[in-house]
Amino acid sequence: NVKGAVKQETFEALTDYVIKTYFKHPSYWKIDGAPYFSIYEFHTFLQIFDNDYAKAAVAIERFRTKVKAAGFPDLHLNGVLWALKGEVLNNAVQYFKLNSATSYVWIHHFELPSFPSTEYAVAAEGYFNGVASGGANNGLEKPASNIPIPYHINVSMGWDSSPRCKNSDDWMTRRDYPFGPVIVNNTPS
């Protein structure tokens, strides 16, 4: 079994559960009446269906049908951009009728420049410049306006992956994740 992927039956059970437990809750976020559902890693989602877009599209359409049967106008399907690059994004829009894209965290698009910490304002500027003008990473190489579906910006409140460093003696040495800088000074004035 691939790390992170689940069985197709598990995905089907998940869709039933989220419709019943979450989508019907009065405070659940809906866009134009459609419950918002986001897939974090499309490549992992595709592994459930042996990387076959057509098979995965059938499962998404079944999900949409269940959502409509539950009384909603449709499903608002969102994809997290860092794993939706190039052909994967285009295929997700085409096969799954992806409604929007978003970002999980600024650092997926903008490498924090200073170590052991980077100022919040610097991280914000890097991310929002990528959204507006491109030149960033993982889906924001071009401005967000080039994405063929609406892009919902992200407001990261900070970033600190140091607790994931497993008490390493050299946790203060910059290298690959999670040994990176933290975002500091995000307190509004």
Predicted features along the sequence, with ranges:
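Glycan-processing catalytic domains of CAZymes
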Residues: 1-189
